[in-house]
C-alpha cells in the first residue's frame, strides 16, 4: 500500500499541526474556532466576478462582490419562530460594509468598458436597470450611511440623489423599482425608527420619504408591480401596542383532537404551540393595507387583517387580496391556515369573494396527491383583469378513478358571474404559458411515471380549443427534455415574453443538450420551433473542445447571440456568437474565479456499479499533488442520493468534461487546502425497478454506489481505499449514517443536519410516498438509528439548533448521538446556536470547517497501522 511521500507530507503538515490536539480536548466551552490561515484566506476572498446582460441586450454589467455573510450577533437579535416562519422582532437597520467592490458596463456592440464609480471605502449594492435600460440605479453604502445614485448610459455619468434630511442612516430593505417613464425610483429603507417607503425624483436628484417608518416587514412590505399605479404597502396598524407577554402561569392545558378523519401531514417546524404563540402571530402579522401615491397620499384599504402581499391586475384596476384567518393550527404552518381570497377595487372596495379555503391539515399520502379544492388563484398575464383558478377534480386524491384530474377556470372582470371552465387535464396541472393571442402551452405531469406533457391550446377560445400534443417526455430523461423558451422583457405589456422571429413563426429554445455519450457530456444548443406544427430546427450547438451556453439573443432573427464559453484550460468568458458562421468575438476577459485553487486538478470521472448503472462525480486533487511522487491520497466523498424510476435515467451523466472546473468555497471542497482529495457529488442513484418503489432496495444500491466510487479512485491510483471519509448534508447526512452502519468502506463520516430515524417522519420523506404503516420494513431498514450499534467508525454530527427543514428536527441528531454513545460509538455532536438547516453566520461556517478538517485529520488522514 502506497502512502504519502515525505515531501508531500511536509507540504501538507501545516494544516494538520494547526489541529494538533485530539477532538476530545475541544468542548463546547472552547467557543468558535477558525480553520487554518490558508482556508480562512479563501473564505475572506471576494466572490468570482460575474456579468449580467441588460434586458435590452446592449450592456454587460460586470461586478466583483464580497461573499455575503451574517454574524452570529445578527442571528442572536430578538427573533420569533411562529407558524413556520422565522423573523426578527426589530428590523435590521445596521449597515454592513458588504456588497459590490467594483462595477463596470461593457457595451455588447464593442468598445471600452465604462467604470461605475464606487467611492473609496464604500460598496455598491442593488443595481437595477430602468425599464428602458437607459439608466442604472444603485446604492453606495458606508458605515451608517447609504446613498442612491443613478447612472445615465448616454452621458456615461452618475449622480447622487440627495435624500430628505441629508442622507439615509439606515439599510436598504428592498427596491420595488422604476416608474415606467424612468422619472421616479421607489425603495424601502430601514432606519432606527423602522422601515419606510421612499421615492427618488431622478430629474430633481432628490429623494423623500412617502410613508411613516411603520412598514410591516414581516408580512411583506411594499409592491409596485407595474411602475405606474400607486404602490401597495402593508403597514403595522396604528396603536398596535406592545408585544404580548408570556403569562406567568398557564391558563389551562393545550388540547388537540381528531375525530376519526384520516389527516396525514409531514413533519413541520416552527409551529404554533399555545395561545400565547397565537397572540404573537397576530401581533406581528396583522397589517393595514394601504395605497401610496408618488406625491405621498396614503389611503387605507380594508380593515386590519393578516394579509399576504397583494397582487395587482395587469390593468392596474384591481387587487387580488389574500387574508389568513382563524382557526389557526398547531399541526401545520401558515401555508395551511384558512385563507380568504378576494378581488378588491383599487379604492379598497370588495368586488368579489373568490374562495375561502378551509384549514389544510391533511393531504393524501400518494404520488400526485395535492390539496382538495381550489389550490391556485392568479391573474392571467395576457388579459387586463382575468383570474385563473386551478382546482383538483379528484379531491386531491390520485387513487380515485376520474377522467380528468384538474380543471383551470377563468373569472373575468367585473367578477359578477361564476368561474367558467377553461381547460381540464388528465394529469396534474403543471402550468400554462401564454405565448400569443392564439397560442398557449398547457402542461400536465404525473409522478407515477415522471412524465410531463405540453399541449398547444387556443387561449382566445372559451374552452381553449382542441389541445394539440407538442411534447411528451420523461423528466428523468435529460436527453428527452425539449428545452426552454428564450424570453425578453416587453415594455408594452410589462412582462417577459418569448422571443419570436419577425414573422411570428418561430420561437427559440435553449437547453443543456444532454447526451448519452459520457465522453462529450452536455452540449447546450439553440433551436427554433414552429409553434403551428411543432417542427424544430437546430441553429447551433456547443462543440468540443468547448462548453458553451446561450445567454441571450441579440436580435429576433437569432442571427447573433451572447454565449458563455469555457474549456478545461480556458476560464468562462462572454462572447458574441454569429449563429450562421459559428464565429465568436470576445466580450469579456474575466479573471480566474478561484485563483486560490488554480493548481487544483479537476476531472469528471465515470464508472459503473455491478448492476450496470453508470455513475459519475467530479474528482479534485489538492494543490501541489503529484501522483507518481506522492502516491495515493486520503479522500473525502460528499454526496446526496437521488431516487429514479429507471436505470437508464439514473445512468445519465450531467455536466461536461469540457467545462472549466474550479472548486467553489463550499465547506467540503475547502478540505483540498488541507491535503485531501475530494470526490464531489458522486452519484448515488436509488432506482425503482419492476414496479417497486426506489426505497425498497435503498441500502444495497447505496453501498454499491459508494464501493464503485472507491474502486474507481483506487483504479486511477489517486485514492487510498483505507483512508476514505464520507459526508453529506440533510439527506446526505442520512446517507452517511447508513453507509457507516451498513458497510465497512469508510474510516469516518461527517453528517450535517440529517434525519436518522424515519419513524419520526412517518408520513413520508424525500420522494417516498408511503407512510410508515404502509411500509414499516422500508422505514426501519433505511433508518441508521436502528443500526446505531453497528456503527463502529467515528462519526461527526453537526446540527443547527433552529433547523427549519421539514423532517430534520434537531432531535434527530440528539437521539442519534445518544444511541451511538449508549452503544459505545465514537461520536462528536456539535450544535450550532441559532442556525437553521443551512448555516449562515460567519462564525458558524468557519467553525464547521474547523470541525470537518480536525475530524478527518484525526480519523482518516493517517495511514492504517498494520500489525
Task: Please name every model-derived segment.
Residues 2-14:
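Bacterial N-terminal signal peptides that target proteins for export
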Residues 13-23:
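Bacterial N-terminal signal peptides
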Residues 25-583, 589, 593-599, 651-652, ...:
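Beta-propeller folds
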Residues 99-103, 108-110, 638, 642, ...:
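Active-site-proximal cap/loop segments of hydrolase catalytic domains
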Residues 238, 326, 393-395, 415, ...:
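Short, glycine-/Ser/Thr-/acidic-enriched flexible segments
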Residues 341, 387, 470, 574, ...:
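Conserved hydrophobic/aromatic pocket- or pore-lining residues that grip, position, or stack substrates
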Residues 588-631:
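N-terminal cap/lid segment of alpha/beta-hydrolase-fold proteins
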Residues 627-630, 636-656:
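Short, surface-exposed "cap/lid" segments of acyl-processing enzymes
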Amino acid at each position: 500500500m502506497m502512502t504519502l511521500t515525505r515531501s508531500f507530507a511536509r507540504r501538507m503538515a501545516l494544516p494538520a499541526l494547526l489541529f494538533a490536539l485530539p477532538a476530545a480536548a475541544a468542548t463546547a466551552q472552547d467557543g468558535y474556532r477558525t480553520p487554518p490561515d490558508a482556508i480562512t484566506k479563501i473564505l475572506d476572498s471576494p466572490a468570482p466576478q460575474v456579468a449580467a446582460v441588460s434586458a435590452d441586450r446592449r450592456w454587460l454589467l460586470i461586478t466583483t462582490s464580497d461573499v455575503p455573510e451574517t454574524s452570529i450577533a445578527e442571528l442572536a437579535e430578538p427573533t420569533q419562530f411562529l407558524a413556520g416562519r422565522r423573523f426578527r422582532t426589530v428590523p435590521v437597520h445596521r449597515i454592513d460594509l458588504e456588497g459590490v467592490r467594483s462595477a463596470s458596463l461593457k457595451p455588447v456592440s464593442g468598445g471600452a468598458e465604462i467604470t461605475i464609480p464606487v467611492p473609496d471605502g464604500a460598496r455598491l449594492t442593488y443595481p437595477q436597470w430602468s425599464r428602458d435600460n437607459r439608466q442604472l440605479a444603485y446604492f453606495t453604502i458606508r458605515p451608517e450611511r447609504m446613498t442612491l445614485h443613478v447612472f445615465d448610459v448616454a452621458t456615461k455619468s452618475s449622480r447622487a440623489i440627495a435624500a430628505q434630511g441629508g442622507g439615509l442612516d439606515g439599510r436598504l430593505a428592498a427596491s420595488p423599482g422604476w416608474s415606467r417613464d424612468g422619472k421616479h425610483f421607489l425603495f424601502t429603507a430601514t432606519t432606527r425608527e423602522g422601515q419606510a417607503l421612499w421615492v427618488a425624483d431622478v430629474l430633481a436628484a432628490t429623494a423623500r420619504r412617502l410613508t411613516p417608518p411603520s412598514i410591516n416587514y414581516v408580512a411583506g412590505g411594499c409592491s409596485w408591480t407595474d411602475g405606474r399605479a400607486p404602490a401597495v404597502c402593508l403597514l403595522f396598524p396604528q396603536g398596535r401596542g406592545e408585544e404580548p407577554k408570556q403569562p406567568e402561569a398557564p391558563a389551562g392545558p393545550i388540547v388537540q383532537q381528531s375525530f376519526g378523519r384520516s389527516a396525514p401531514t409531514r413533519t413541520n417546524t416552527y409551529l404554533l404551540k399555545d395561545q400565547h404563540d397565537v397572540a404573537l402571530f397576530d401581533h406581528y402579522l396583522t397589517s393595514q393595507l394601504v395605497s401610496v401615491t408618488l406625491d405621498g397620499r396614503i389611503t387605507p384599504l380594508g380593515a386590519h387583517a393578516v394579509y399576504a402581499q397583494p397582487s395587482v391586475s395587469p390593468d392596474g384596476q384591481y387587487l387580488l387580496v389574500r387574508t389568513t384567518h382563524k382557526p389557526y393550527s398547531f399541526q401545520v404552518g401558515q401555508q395551511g391556515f384558512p385563507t380568504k381570497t378576494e378581488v378588491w377595487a383599487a379604492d379598497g372596495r370588495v368586488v368579489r369573494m373568490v374562495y375561502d379555503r378551509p384549514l389544510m391539515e391533511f393531504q393524501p399520502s400518494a404520488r400526485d396527491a395535492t390539496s382538495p379544492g381550489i389550490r391556485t388563484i392568479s391573474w392571467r398575464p395576457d388579459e387586463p383583469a382575468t383570474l385563473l383558478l386551478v382546482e383538483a377534480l379528484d379531491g386531491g386524491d390520485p387513487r380515485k378513478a376520474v377522467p380528468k384530474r384538474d380543471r383551470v377556470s377563468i373569472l373575468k372582470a367585473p367578477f359578477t358571474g361564476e368561474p367558467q371552465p377553461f381547460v381540464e387535464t388528465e394529469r396534474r396541472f403543471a402550468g400554462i404559458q401564454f405565448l400569443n393571442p392564439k397560442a398557449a402551452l398547457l402542461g400536465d405531469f404525473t409522478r407515477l411515471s415522471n412524465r410531463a406533457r405540453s399541449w398547444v391550446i387556443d387561449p382566445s377560445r372559451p374552452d381553449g380549443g382542441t389541445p394539440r400534443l407538442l411534447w411528451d417526455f420523461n423528466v428523468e430523461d435529460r436527453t428527452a427534455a425539449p428545452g426552454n423558451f428564450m424570453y425578453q422583457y416587453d415594455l408594452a405589456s410589462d412582462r417577459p415574453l418569448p422571443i419570436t422571429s419577425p414573422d411570428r413563426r418561430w420561437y427559440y429554445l435553449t437547453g443543456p443538450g444532454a447526451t448519452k455519450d459520457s465522453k462529450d457530456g452536455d452540449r447546450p444548443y439553440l433551436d427554433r420551433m414552429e409553434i403551428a406544427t411543432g417542427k424544430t430546427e437546430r441553429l447551433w450547438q456547443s462543440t468540443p473542445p468547448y462548453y458553451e451556453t446561450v445567454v441571450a439573443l441579440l436580435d429576433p432573427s437569432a442571427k447573433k447571440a451572447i454565449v458563455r464559453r469555457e474549456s478545461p484550460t480556458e476560464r468562462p468568458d462572454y462572447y458574441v456568437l454569429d449563429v450562421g458562421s459559428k464565429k465568436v468575438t470576445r466580450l469579456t476577459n474575466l479573471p480566474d474565479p478561484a485563483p486560490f485553487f488554480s493548481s487544483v486538478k479537476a476531472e469528471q470521472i465515470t464508472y459503473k456499479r455491478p448492476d450496470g448503472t453508470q455513475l459519475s462525480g467530479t474528482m479534485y486533487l489538492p494543490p501541489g499533488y503529484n501522483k507518481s511522487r506522492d502516491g495515493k491520497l486520503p479522500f473525502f466523498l460528499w454526496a446526496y442520493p437521488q431516487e429514479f424510476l429507471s436505470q437508464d435515467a439514473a445512468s445519465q451523466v450531467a455536466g461536461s468534461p469540457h467545462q472549466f472546473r474550479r472548486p467553489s468555497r463550499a465547506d467540503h471542497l475547502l478540505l483540498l487546502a488541507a491535503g485531501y482529495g475530494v470526490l464531489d457529488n458522486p452519484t448515488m442513484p436509488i432506482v425503482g425497478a419492476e414496479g417497486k418503489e426506489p426505497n425498497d432496495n435503498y441500502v444495497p444500491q447505496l453501498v454499491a454506489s459508494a464501493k464503485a466510487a472507491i474502486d474507481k479512485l483506487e483504479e486511477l491510483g489517486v485514492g487510498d481505499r483505507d483512508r476514505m471519509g464520507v459526508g453529506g448534508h440533510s439527506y446526505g447526512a442520512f446517507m452517511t449514517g447508513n453507509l457507516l452502519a451498513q458497510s465497512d468502506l469508510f474510516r469516518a463520516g461527517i453528517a450535517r443536519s440529517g434525519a436518522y430515524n424515519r419513524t419520526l417522519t412517518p408520513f413520508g420523506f424525500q420522494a417516498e410516498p408511503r407512510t410508515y404503516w404502509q411500509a414499516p420494513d422500508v422505514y426501519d431498514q433505511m433508518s441508521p438509528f436502528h443500526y446505531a450499534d453497528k456503527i463502529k467508525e467515528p462519526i461527526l454530527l453537526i446540527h443547527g439548533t433552529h433547523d427549519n427543514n421539514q423532517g430534520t428536527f434537531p432531535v434527530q441528531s440528539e437521539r442519534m448521538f445518544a444511541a451511538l454513545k449508549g452503544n459505545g460509538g465514537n461520536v462528536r455532536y456539535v450544535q450550532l446556536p441559532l442556525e437553521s438547516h443551512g448555516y449562515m453566520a460567519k462564525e458558524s461556517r468557519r467553525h464547521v470547517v474547523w470541525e470537518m478538517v480536525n475530524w478527518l485529520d484525526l480519523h482518516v488522514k493517517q495511514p492504517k497501522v498494520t500489525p
